[in-house]
Amino acid sequence: MIPVFAVGRSQEVMLVLEKLHSEGKLKDMPVYLDGMIWEATALHSAYPEYLNNNLRNKVYQNQDNPFRSEIFNKVESTDMRQEICGREEPAIVLATSGMVNGGPVMEYLRNWAPDFNSTMVFVGYQAAGTMGQRVQQGAKEIHLHDREKGGTIPVKVNMNIETCEGFSGHSDKRQLMRYLRTIRPRPKIVLLNHGDPQKCEQFANDIRRKVRLDCRVPSNLETIRFM
């Protein structure tokens, strides 16, 4: 089971899985796409001009379109989702949401978390306070919504937990610093408003020291005057 965001990260993982399958490095098993992944992927095929050259050419040729590989299967219904949860044969499931805080991934988590033979692979950042972060950090028991009685029920986490680094939708520190050095006209002030507070403060200090720009990390509800 791989928790993913429907746009961007899903397609990156799909390309990796399709490549491994075509090279014979991935066992022959179905890959199920649950949530809005199928619809979001269709947009990538509909507008290949926005993809890199290699992928664009494959999409134009159609028969080589990796997004239309036979290994990918759309989860069409709740009943189909339940069938997948109950199957004994190996399978890979990509499901939203990426931080395991809602969406169809919760149903797979409910069914597979207690299973020693199941594995959850994280391919994206897990924000503080999310279910994804708790599982990633080794929680042995989680509480999930009880659909029948309301409230929550405890669920043991016996499945294997893996984190695959390298997938990122953001520029890294080096790329951001280079951007700030070359942007014209030169900004008068830089605001950092997305990220862990401690890392934002560290990055702001580096910007002030190395790029010589006024950089601030605003708090929630803080007002900053630009004029």
Region annotations inferred by a language model:
Residues 1-227:
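Acidic/His-rich, metal-assisted hydrolase cores and their charged scaffolds
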